[in-house]
UniProtKB/Swiss-Prot annotation:
Protein location: Secreted
Keywords noted in UniProt: Hypotensive agent, Metalloenzyme inhibitor, Metalloprotease inhibitor, Protease inhibitor, Pyrrolidone carboxylic acid, Secreted, Toxin
The protein's name in its UniProt record: Bradykinin-potentiating peptide S4,1,2
Family: Belongs to the bradykinin-potentiating peptide family.
Length: 11
């Protein structure tokens, strides 16, 4: 179980 996807952080 990798868990929920992480939010995309802008560069």
């Amino acid at each position: 179980q990798g868990g929920p996807p992480r939010p995309q952080i802008p560069p």
